[in-house]
Swiss-Prot record:
Keywords associated with the record: DNA-binding, Metal-binding, Nucleus, Transcription, Transcription regulation, Zinc, Zinc-finger
Binding site for Zn(2+) 2: C223, C226, H230, C242
GO annotations of cellular component type: nucleus
Molecular function per GO: DNA binding; zinc ion binding
Compartments where located: Nucleus
Chain intervals with Polar residues compositional bias: 460-469
Zinc fingers (SBP-type) by residue: 179-256
Keyword Zinc: yes
Disordered: annotated span: 96-118, 446-469
Provenance organism: Oryza sativa subsp. indica (Rice)
Domain comment quoted from the record: The SBP-type zinc finger is required for the binding to DNA.
Name of the protein in its database record: Squamosa promoter-binding-like protein 3
Protein backbone atom coordinates (compact mmCIF):
# COMPACT_ATOMS: atom_id res chain seq x y z
CA UNK A 1 0.00 0.00 0.00
CA UNK A 2 2.96 2.27 0.50
CA UNK A 3 3.84 2.00 -3.14
CA UNK A 4 0.32 3.05 -4.03
CA UNK A 5 0.67 6.22 -1.98
CA UNK A 6 3.95 7.08 -3.65
CA UNK A 7 2.43 6.65 -7.09
CA UNK A 8 -0.46 8.87 -6.13
CA UNK A 9 1.91 11.65 -4.98
CA UNK A 10 3.86 11.50 -8.21
CA UNK A 11 0.79 11.61 -10.42
CA UNK A 12 -0.91 14.37 -8.47
CA UNK A 13 1.68 16.95 -9.51
CA UNK A 14 1.17 16.05 -13.12
CA UNK A 15 -2.63 16.00 -13.01
CA UNK A 16 -3.05 19.27 -11.23
CA UNK A 17 -1.53 22.52 -12.47
CA UNK A 18 -2.41 25.06 -9.85
CA UNK A 19 -0.92 27.94 -11.77
CA UNK A 20 -3.32 27.48 -14.70
CA UNK A 21 -6.48 26.92 -12.69
CA UNK A 22 -9.09 29.74 -12.62
CA UNK A 23 -9.70 31.55 -9.36
CA UNK A 24 -12.41 30.07 -7.17
CA UNK A 25 -12.47 32.43 -4.22
CA UNK A 26 -14.24 35.73 -3.73
CA UNK A 27 -11.32 37.71 -5.19
CA UNK A 28 -9.57 37.03 -8.46
CA UNK A 29 -6.16 38.05 -7.00
CA UNK A 30 -6.03 35.33 -4.45
CA UNK A 31 -3.56 32.54 -4.99
CA UNK A 32 -5.28 29.20 -5.40
CA UNK A 33 -2.46 27.54 -3.51
CA UNK A 34 -3.21 29.58 -0.42
CA UNK A 35 -6.96 29.44 -0.77
CA UNK A 36 -7.68 25.87 -1.62
CA UNK A 37 -6.59 23.09 0.66
CA UNK A 38 -7.09 19.61 -0.63
CA UNK A 39 -7.61 16.69 1.60
CA UNK A 40 -7.66 13.25 0.28
CA UNK A 41 -9.45 10.63 2.23
CA UNK A 42 -9.62 7.10 1.03
CA UNK A 43 -12.29 5.03 2.67
CA UNK A 44 -11.78 1.27 2.63
CA UNK A 45 -12.66 -1.74 4.66
CA UNK A 46 -10.44 -1.24 7.67
CA UNK A 47 -7.71 0.30 5.53
CA UNK A 48 -6.41 3.83 6.08
CA UNK A 49 -3.79 5.09 3.72
CA UNK A 50 -2.76 7.73 6.19
CA UNK A 51 -1.09 9.82 3.63
CA UNK A 52 -2.13 13.42 3.32
CA UNK A 53 -0.62 15.91 1.02
CA UNK A 54 -1.41 19.44 0.02
CA UNK A 55 -0.91 18.56 -3.62
CA UNK A 56 -3.34 15.64 -3.65
CA UNK A 57 -6.43 17.82 -3.76
CA UNK A 58 -8.39 16.13 -6.49
CA UNK A 59 -8.22 14.20 -9.66
CA UNK A 60 -9.75 11.46 -11.65
CA UNK A 61 -9.68 8.34 -9.62
CA UNK A 62 -11.44 5.02 -9.92
CA UNK A 63 -10.99 2.46 -7.24
CA UNK A 64 -10.69 -1.22 -7.93
CA UNK A 65 -9.98 -4.37 -6.05
CA UNK A 66 -6.39 -3.18 -5.37
CA UNK A 67 -7.64 -0.94 -2.55
CA UNK A 68 -8.82 -3.87 -0.60
CA UNK A 69 -12.51 -3.24 -1.15
CA UNK A 70 -14.36 -6.26 -2.34
CA UNK A 71 -16.56 -4.42 -4.88
CA UNK A 72 -15.16 -3.47 -8.26
CA UNK A 73 -17.47 -0.44 -8.60
CA UNK A 74 -17.19 2.91 -6.86
CA UNK A 75 -17.99 6.51 -7.66
CA UNK A 76 -16.88 10.03 -6.83
CA UNK A 77 -19.18 12.50 -5.14
CA UNK A 78 -18.22 16.10 -4.60
CA UNK A 79 -19.80 18.35 -2.03
CA UNK A 80 -19.08 22.01 -1.87
CA UNK A 81 -19.35 23.50 1.58
CA UNK A 82 -19.16 27.09 2.64
CA UNK A 83 -17.40 27.10 6.02
CA UNK A 84 -16.34 30.15 7.94
CA UNK A 85 -12.86 29.83 6.47
CA UNK A 86 -11.51 32.24 3.96
CA UNK A 87 -11.55 29.82 1.01
CA UNK A 88 -13.57 26.91 -0.30
CA UNK A 89 -12.56 23.40 0.46
CA UNK A 90 -12.92 20.61 -2.06
CA UNK A 91 -13.39 17.33 -0.32
CA UNK A 92 -13.16 14.06 -2.17
CA UNK A 93 -14.96 11.20 -0.54
CA UNK A 94 -14.49 7.77 -2.01
CA UNK A 95 -17.28 5.64 -0.71
CA UNK A 96 -18.82 2.37 -1.64
CA UNK A 97 -21.62 2.04 -4.19
CA UNK A 98 -24.26 1.28 -1.61
CA UNK A 99 -23.52 4.34 0.49
CA UNK A 100 -23.48 6.48 -2.64
CA UNK A 101 -26.87 5.23 -3.81
CA UNK A 102 -28.42 5.94 -0.44
CA UNK A 103 -27.13 9.49 -0.38
CA UNK A 104 -28.29 10.18 -3.92
CA UNK A 105 -31.78 8.86 -3.26
CA UNK A 106 -32.11 11.15 -0.30
CA UNK A 107 -30.73 14.24 -2.01
CA UNK A 108 -32.47 14.23 -5.39
CA UNK A 109 -35.94 15.41 -6.31
CA UNK A 110 -37.53 15.73 -9.71
CA UNK A 111 -38.90 19.10 -10.62
CA UNK A 112 -40.68 18.22 -13.86
CA UNK A 113 -42.17 14.89 -14.89
CA UNK A 114 -41.83 15.66 -18.57
CA UNK A 115 -38.13 14.94 -18.45
CA UNK A 116 -37.04 18.18 -20.07
CA UNK A 117 -35.14 19.47 -17.06
CA UNK A 118 -33.79 17.45 -14.19
CA UNK A 119 -31.66 19.06 -11.55
CA UNK A 120 -30.52 17.13 -8.50
CA UNK A 121 -31.21 18.90 -5.26
CA UNK A 122 -29.13 17.76 -2.36
CA UNK A 123 -30.96 17.52 0.92
CA UNK A 124 -28.52 16.68 3.63
CA UNK A 125 -30.66 15.90 6.59
CA UNK A 126 -34.11 15.44 4.91
CA UNK A 127 -35.44 11.90 4.88
CA UNK A 128 -39.22 12.23 4.35
CA UNK A 129 -40.39 12.11 0.67
CA UNK A 130 -41.71 15.17 -1.09
CA UNK A 131 -45.44 15.47 -1.69
CA UNK A 132 -46.34 16.95 -5.09
CA UNK A 133 -49.62 18.18 -6.57
CA UNK A 134 -50.06 16.99 -10.14
CA UNK A 135 -52.25 19.22 -12.32
CA UNK A 136 -52.31 18.09 -15.91
CA UNK A 137 -48.79 17.47 -17.13
CA UNK A 138 -47.11 19.42 -14.34
CA UNK A 139 -46.40 18.47 -10.79
CA UNK A 140 -46.08 21.18 -8.15
CA UNK A 141 -43.88 20.56 -5.08
CA UNK A 142 -43.42 22.41 -1.84
CA UNK A 143 -40.94 25.26 -1.94
CA UNK A 144 -37.83 23.59 -0.47
CA UNK A 145 -34.96 25.54 -1.99
CA UNK A 146 -36.40 28.99 -1.50
CA UNK A 147 -38.17 30.00 -4.68
CA UNK A 148 -36.54 27.64 -7.21
CA UNK A 149 -39.76 25.85 -8.17
CA UNK A 150 -41.55 26.64 -11.37
CA UNK A 151 -44.69 27.95 -9.75
CA UNK A 152 -45.19 28.60 -6.09
CA UNK A 153 -47.46 30.48 -3.80
CA UNK A 154 -46.71 32.33 -0.59
CA UNK A 155 -48.08 29.41 1.37
CA UNK A 156 -45.62 27.02 -0.27
CA UNK A 157 -48.02 25.19 -2.62
CA UNK A 158 -48.89 26.53 -6.06
CA UNK A 159 -52.59 27.00 -6.87
CA UNK A 160 -53.86 26.63 -10.45
CA UNK A 161 -55.82 29.48 -11.99
CA UNK A 162 -59.50 28.52 -12.40
CA UNK A 163 -60.74 28.06 -15.98
CA UNK A 164 -63.36 30.44 -17.48
CA UNK A 165 -65.94 27.64 -17.53
CA UNK A 166 -65.47 27.05 -13.83
CA UNK A 167 -65.74 30.76 -13.12
CA UNK A 168 -68.97 30.92 -15.09
CA UNK A 169 -70.42 28.03 -13.14
CA UNK A 170 -69.46 29.71 -9.91
CA UNK A 171 -71.13 32.91 -11.08
CA UNK A 172 -74.31 31.07 -12.02
CA UNK A 173 -74.30 29.31 -8.68
CA UNK A 174 -73.99 32.64 -6.92
CA UNK A 175 -76.91 34.00 -8.91
CA UNK A 176 -79.01 30.99 -8.09
CA UNK A 177 -78.36 31.45 -4.42
CA UNK A 178 -79.93 34.89 -4.65
CA UNK A 179 -83.69 35.18 -4.98
CA UNK A 180 -84.47 35.94 -8.66
CA UNK A 181 -86.91 38.71 -9.48
CA UNK A 182 -88.72 39.67 -12.65
CA UNK A 183 -86.67 42.06 -14.78
CA UNK A 184 -89.68 43.98 -16.07
CA UNK A 185 -89.86 47.49 -14.75
CA UNK A 186 -92.47 47.90 -12.06
CA UNK A 187 -92.61 44.17 -11.41
CA UNK A 188 -90.62 42.99 -8.45
CA UNK A 189 -92.15 39.55 -8.12
CA UNK A 190 -90.06 36.99 -6.29
CA UNK A 191 -89.51 34.02 -8.60
CA UNK A 192 -88.18 31.63 -5.98
CA UNK A 193 -91.42 29.64 -6.08
CA UNK A 194 -91.97 30.01 -9.85
CA UNK A 195 -91.17 27.49 -12.55
CA UNK A 196 -87.52 26.81 -13.37
CA UNK A 197 -88.01 28.30 -16.83
CA UNK A 198 -89.15 31.63 -15.43
CA UNK A 199 -86.49 31.62 -12.73
CA UNK A 200 -83.78 31.01 -15.32
CA UNK A 201 -84.85 33.84 -17.63
CA UNK A 202 -85.98 36.13 -14.80
CA UNK A 203 -89.45 36.85 -16.06
CA UNK A 204 -92.74 36.11 -14.40
CA UNK A 205 -95.38 34.07 -16.18
CA UNK A 206 -97.84 36.96 -16.84
CA UNK A 207 -95.13 39.16 -18.36
CA UNK A 208 -93.85 36.31 -20.53
CA UNK A 209 -97.18 36.46 -22.39
CA UNK A 210 -97.75 40.21 -22.32
CA UNK A 211 -97.77 41.92 -25.71
CA UNK A 212 -95.74 44.90 -24.51
CA UNK A 213 -93.51 45.39 -21.46
CA UNK A 214 -90.85 47.87 -20.43
CA UNK A 215 -87.39 46.40 -19.90
CA UNK A 216 -84.44 48.74 -19.31
CA UNK A 217 -86.50 51.68 -20.52
CA UNK A 218 -87.42 50.07 -23.88
CA UNK A 219 -90.62 48.53 -25.13
CA UNK A 220 -90.02 44.83 -25.43
CA UNK A 221 -91.83 41.58 -25.79
CA UNK A 222 -90.78 38.17 -24.55
CA UNK A 223 -90.19 35.56 -27.27
CA UNK A 224 -90.96 32.06 -26.06
CA UNK A 225 -88.82 30.52 -28.80
CA UNK A 226 -85.71 32.60 -28.18
CA UNK A 227 -86.44 33.01 -24.44
CA UNK A 228 -85.39 36.63 -24.74
CA UNK A 229 -86.94 40.06 -25.02
CA UNK A 230 -87.16 41.48 -28.55
CA UNK A 231 -88.43 44.67 -30.06
CA UNK A 232 -92.08 44.92 -31.00
CA UNK A 233 -91.25 45.19 -34.71
CA UNK A 234 -90.01 41.59 -34.75
CA UNK A 235 -93.36 40.13 -33.76
CA UNK A 236 -96.63 39.57 -35.51
CA UNK A 237 -99.80 40.71 -33.80
CA UNK A 238 -100.91 37.59 -31.96
CA UNK A 239 -97.85 35.38 -32.21
CA UNK A 240 -95.88 34.69 -29.07
CA UNK A 241 -92.68 33.99 -31.00
CA UNK A 242 -90.69 36.36 -33.15
CA UNK A 243 -91.07 36.27 -36.90
CA UNK A 244 -87.64 34.84 -37.59
CA UNK A 245 -88.05 31.87 -35.28
CA UNK A 246 -91.52 31.17 -36.62
CA UNK A 247 -90.18 31.11 -40.18
CA UNK A 248 -87.44 28.66 -39.24
CA UNK A 249 -89.89 26.58 -37.25
CA UNK A 250 -92.37 26.33 -40.10
CA UNK A 251 -89.68 25.61 -42.68
CA UNK A 252 -88.49 22.62 -40.67
CA UNK A 253 -91.90 21.10 -40.07
CA UNK A 254 -93.96 21.95 -43.13
CA UNK A 255 -93.54 20.11 -46.37
CA UNK A 256 -93.56 22.13 -49.59
CA UNK A 257 -97.06 22.18 -51.07
CA UNK A 258 -97.44 21.19 -54.75
CA UNK A 259 -98.41 23.99 -57.07
CA UNK A 260 -102.17 24.17 -57.54
CA UNK A 261 -103.40 23.83 -61.10
CA UNK A 262 -106.14 26.38 -61.74
CA UNK A 263 -108.31 25.98 -64.83
CA UNK A 264 -110.97 28.41 -65.92
CA UNK A 265 -114.32 27.22 -67.23
CA UNK A 266 -113.41 28.06 -70.81
CA UNK A 267 -110.10 26.26 -70.53
CA UNK A 268 -111.75 23.22 -68.99
CA UNK A 269 -114.40 23.06 -71.71
CA UNK A 270 -111.70 23.32 -74.34
CA UNK A 271 -109.86 20.39 -72.83
CA UNK A 272 -112.99 18.26 -72.59
CA UNK A 273 -114.74 19.03 -75.86
CA UNK A 274 -112.05 20.44 -78.07
CA UNK A 275 -110.72 17.08 -79.23
CA UNK A 276 -114.18 15.72 -80.04
CA UNK A 277 -115.05 18.78 -82.12
CA UNK A 278 -111.78 18.61 -84.00
CA UNK A 279 -112.35 14.95 -84.74
CA UNK A 280 -115.81 15.70 -86.09
CA UNK A 281 -114.31 18.40 -88.29
CA UNK A 282 -111.70 16.02 -89.66
CA UNK A 283 -114.34 13.35 -90.22
CA UNK A 284 -116.22 15.36 -92.82
CA UNK A 285 -113.28 17.41 -94.04
CA UNK A 286 -115.00 20.63 -93.06
CA UNK A 287 -113.79 24.11 -92.37
CA UNK A 288 -113.24 25.29 -88.79
CA UNK A 289 -116.03 25.64 -86.26
CA UNK A 290 -118.95 27.85 -87.29
CA UNK A 291 -118.26 27.81 -91.02
CA UNK A 292 -120.33 26.33 -93.80
CA UNK A 293 -119.13 24.12 -96.58
CA UNK A 294 -120.94 22.43 -99.43
CA UNK A 295 -120.10 19.25 -101.23
CA UNK A 296 -121.91 17.71 -104.14
CA UNK A 297 -122.58 14.04 -104.27
CA UNK A 298 -120.75 11.76 -106.63
CA UNK A 299 -123.87 11.42 -108.74
CA UNK A 300 -124.22 15.14 -109.39
CA UNK A 301 -126.40 15.65 -112.44
CA UNK A 302 -128.56 18.38 -113.91
CA UNK A 303 -131.72 16.56 -112.94
CA UNK A 304 -133.77 18.87 -110.68
CA UNK A 305 -134.63 16.00 -108.41
CA UNK A 306 -131.01 15.17 -107.52
CA UNK A 307 -129.59 15.38 -104.01
CA UNK A 308 -127.42 18.21 -102.86
CA UNK A 309 -125.62 17.81 -99.52
CA UNK A 310 -124.47 20.67 -97.38
CA UNK A 311 -122.14 19.99 -94.46
CA UNK A 312 -122.29 22.27 -91.49
CA UNK A 313 -120.83 22.36 -88.04
CA UNK A 314 -122.80 24.00 -85.28
CA UNK A 315 -122.70 24.02 -81.48
CA UNK A 316 -123.91 21.00 -79.58
CA UNK A 317 -127.70 21.12 -79.34
CA UNK A 318 -130.72 18.89 -79.51
CA UNK A 319 -130.04 16.68 -82.49
CA UNK A 320 -132.40 16.16 -85.43
CA UNK A 321 -131.84 14.86 -88.92
CA UNK A 322 -133.38 15.95 -92.22
CA UNK A 323 -133.53 14.48 -95.67
CA UNK A 324 -135.10 15.95 -98.76
CA UNK A 325 -135.90 15.13 -102.34
CA UNK A 326 -136.43 17.51 -105.29
CA UNK A 327 -134.80 20.42 -103.48
CA UNK A 328 -137.31 20.72 -100.64
CA UNK A 329 -135.75 23.05 -98.05
CA UNK A 330 -135.29 21.87 -94.51
CA UNK A 331 -134.49 24.07 -91.50
CA UNK A 332 -132.82 22.00 -88.86
CA UNK A 333 -130.74 22.22 -85.70
CA UNK A 334 -128.09 19.58 -85.73
CA UNK A 335 -125.04 18.48 -83.82
CA UNK A 336 -121.50 18.87 -84.98
CA UNK A 337 -120.68 17.22 -88.29
CA UNK A 338 -124.26 16.38 -89.44
CA UNK A 339 -125.07 16.07 -93.13
CA UNK A 340 -128.02 18.25 -94.08
CA UNK A 341 -129.69 17.07 -97.30
CA UNK A 342 -131.96 19.85 -98.53
CA UNK A 343 -135.37 18.15 -98.52
CA UNK A 344 -138.24 17.15 -96.33
CA UNK A 345 -138.36 17.76 -92.62
CA UNK A 346 -137.61 14.95 -90.26
CA UNK A 347 -137.83 15.78 -86.56
CA UNK A 348 -136.39 13.86 -83.67
CA UNK A 349 -139.71 12.18 -82.82
CA UNK A 350 -139.81 10.51 -86.20
CA UNK A 351 -141.92 12.86 -88.41
CA UNK A 352 -140.75 13.36 -91.96
CA UNK A 353 -142.48 15.69 -94.47
CA UNK A 354 -142.14 15.15 -98.18
CA UNK A 355 -143.30 17.28 -101.11
CA UNK A 356 -146.16 15.01 -102.23
CA UNK A 357 -147.15 13.39 -98.96
CA UNK A 358 -146.38 13.32 -95.33
CA UNK A 359 -145.06 10.01 -94.20
CA UNK A 360 -144.51 9.21 -90.60
CA UNK A 361 -141.41 7.14 -90.12
CA UNK A 362 -141.21 5.59 -86.71
CA UNK A 363 -137.55 4.90 -86.69
CA UNK A 364 -136.13 6.86 -83.83
CA UNK A 365 -133.33 4.41 -83.31
CA UNK A 366 -131.87 5.26 -86.68
CA UNK A 367 -132.14 8.94 -85.98
CA UNK A 368 -130.45 8.55 -82.66
CA UNK A 369 -127.67 6.54 -84.19
CA UNK A 370 -127.02 9.39 -86.62
CA UNK A 371 -126.62 11.95 -83.84
CA UNK A 372 -124.68 12.24 -80.63
CA UNK A 373 -126.36 10.74 -77.60
CA UNK A 374 -124.40 13.06 -75.35
CA UNK A 375 -120.99 14.54 -74.81
CA UNK A 376 -119.70 11.13 -73.78
CA UNK A 377 -120.82 9.58 -77.11
CA UNK A 378 -119.63 12.38 -79.35
CA UNK A 379 -117.37 10.14 -81.52
CA UNK A 380 -120.29 7.70 -82.10
CA UNK A 381 -122.22 10.50 -83.77
CA UNK A 382 -119.86 10.39 -86.72
CA UNK A 383 -120.38 6.64 -87.00
CA UNK A 384 -124.05 7.18 -87.80
CA UNK A 385 -123.49 10.04 -90.23
CA UNK A 386 -120.96 8.32 -92.44
CA UNK A 387 -122.14 7.29 -95.86
CA UNK A 388 -120.62 3.91 -96.46
CA UNK A 389 -120.30 2.34 -99.84
CA UNK A 390 -123.54 0.55 -100.67
CA UNK A 391 -122.94 -2.66 -102.47
CA UNK A 392 -124.51 -6.02 -102.42
CA UNK A 393 -123.80 -6.25 -98.70
CA UNK A 394 -125.49 -2.92 -98.15
CA UNK A 395 -128.48 -4.00 -100.17
CA UNK A 396 -128.73 -7.15 -98.11
CA UNK A 397 -128.96 -5.05 -94.96
CA UNK A 398 -132.36 -3.75 -95.99
CA UNK A 399 -135.11 -4.82 -93.69
CA UNK A 400 -137.53 -7.28 -95.26
CA UNK A 401 -140.52 -5.44 -93.79
CA UNK A 402 -139.61 -2.11 -95.36
CA UNK A 403 -142.18 -0.45 -97.56
CA UNK A 404 -140.76 0.56 -100.91
CA UNK A 405 -142.93 2.14 -103.57
CA UNK A 406 -143.00 0.18 -106.82
CA UNK A 407 -141.92 3.24 -108.73
CA UNK A 408 -138.87 3.76 -106.61
CA UNK A 409 -135.77 1.75 -107.34
CA UNK A 410 -132.72 1.60 -105.19
CA UNK A 411 -129.79 3.31 -106.79
CA UNK A 412 -127.27 1.46 -104.75
CA UNK A 413 -126.21 -0.73 -107.62
CA UNK A 414 -126.38 1.96 -110.31
CA UNK A 415 -124.87 4.99 -108.64
CA UNK A 416 -121.80 5.69 -106.60
CA UNK A 417 -122.65 6.85 -103.10
CA UNK A 418 -120.99 9.67 -101.25
CA UNK A 419 -117.87 8.32 -99.55
CA UNK A 420 -116.77 9.73 -96.24
CA UNK A 421 -113.41 9.00 -94.63
CA UNK A 422 -113.35 6.58 -91.74
CA UNK A 423 -111.14 8.03 -89.00
CA UNK A 424 -109.09 6.01 -86.55
CA UNK A 425 -111.57 6.73 -83.78
CA UNK A 426 -113.99 4.21 -85.26
CA UNK A 427 -111.79 1.29 -84.31
CA UNK A 428 -113.40 0.93 -80.91
CA UNK A 429 -116.91 1.84 -82.08
CA UNK A 430 -119.94 -0.09 -83.30
CA UNK A 431 -119.97 -2.94 -85.79
CA UNK A 432 -121.12 -2.59 -89.38
CA UNK A 433 -124.59 -3.85 -88.53
CA UNK A 434 -124.94 -1.18 -85.89
CA UNK A 435 -123.45 1.64 -87.92
CA UNK A 436 -125.77 4.04 -89.65
CA UNK A 437 -126.21 3.63 -93.33
CA UNK A 438 -127.92 6.16 -95.57
CA UNK A 439 -129.39 4.82 -98.70
CA UNK A 440 -130.55 7.42 -101.16
CA UNK A 441 -133.24 6.68 -103.66
CA UNK A 442 -134.05 8.54 -106.83
CA UNK A 443 -137.26 8.56 -108.80
CA UNK A 444 -137.66 6.66 -112.01
CA UNK A 445 -139.53 8.64 -114.65
CA UNK A 446 -141.56 11.76 -114.23
CA UNK A 447 -144.57 10.28 -112.47
CA UNK A 448 -146.01 11.89 -109.39
CA UNK A 449 -145.92 8.80 -107.25
CA UNK A 450 -144.84 8.98 -103.67
CA UNK A 451 -141.13 8.70 -102.95
CA UNK A 452 -139.92 6.98 -99.85
CA UNK A 453 -136.58 7.16 -98.17
CA UNK A 454 -135.57 3.79 -96.80
CA UNK A 455 -133.71 3.92 -93.53
CA UNK A 456 -132.37 0.68 -92.09
CA UNK A 457 -133.57 -0.18 -88.64
CA UNK A 458 -130.85 -0.48 -85.98
CA UNK A 459 -130.44 -3.52 -83.84
CA UNK A 460 -130.85 -1.79 -80.46
CA UNK A 461 -133.85 -0.37 -78.68
CA UNK A 462 -134.94 3.22 -78.33
CA UNK A 463 -135.36 3.45 -74.58
CA UNK A 464 -132.14 5.42 -74.12
CA UNK A 465 -133.11 8.04 -76.64
CA UNK A 466 -136.67 8.39 -75.37
CA UNK A 467 -135.22 9.55 -72.08
CA UNK A 468 -133.42 12.38 -73.80
CA UNK A 469 -136.72 14.00 -74.78
Amino acid sequence: MGSFGMDWNQKSSVLWDWENMPPIGNSANENPKNVMLAESKLAGVGVDIGHESGHSSGGTFSSSSEIGYGSSKSSISASIDSPSKVGNTIELNFASAEEHDKNMDKGKSKVDDTGTSRSPVVAANRVEPLIGLKLGKRTYFEDVCGGQNVKSSPSGVSVATPSPGLAKKVKVAQQNTQNPHCQVEGCNVDLSSAKPYHRKHRVCEPHSKTLKVIVAGLERRFCQQCSRFHGLAEFDQKKRSCRRRLHDHNARRRKPQPEAISLSSSRLSTLLYGDARQQASFLFGQAPYGQMGSCASSWDNPVPGGFKFTATKAPWSRPTIAAGVDGTHVSNQQASGNVLPHGAHHSFDGLMAFKETNAKVLNQGMEASAVASGSARGPDFEHALSLLSIDSVGAANLQPGSQIHPGVTAIAGTSNPVMMPSPAIWQGGLSLDQQAQFQAFDRLGNDDDEDHLQLPKPSYDNSHYDQMN
